[in-house]
């Protein structure tokens, strides 16, 4: 597993983990749209799961419509369920493991928008790889409400139980605005 996060390397590509449900809160769909636009405005390539539905579809479509570079990575068995977004380049893979590995390899950083169990699985694996020193890429959770608060409370519980190192928070940021998210990606302190 290559790590493209050498100190001083410019941020060029952001992997976005997020939900594929169209029936979630409109606020989450709106956040995904605005985040995609923000990626394009900053000339950052979006790498994501390749779907045209839910937050992932909204984010990719917004980035693409704003002139951004988008790369989707889709396992063949999910083509019908997540409906591959055909307007952007995409790579087809056979397994979820290949998808996650390729998303990792193609990205300089990770942003986690609201999502379900698949989003959590991707985010936790990325954090686990970071904990194992397999990479030093930024991992930033973003929600404008307290969507991720229960996750971070659980992580703090594991720290207090001596199951997760106390420096866990050094490997991840929890932001509540797009501006704070990009500041965290760039290693700059901004209001959360």
Predicted regions and their residues:
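Active-site/ligand-binding-proximal alpha/beta "capping" segment
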Residues: 98-133, 140, 189-192
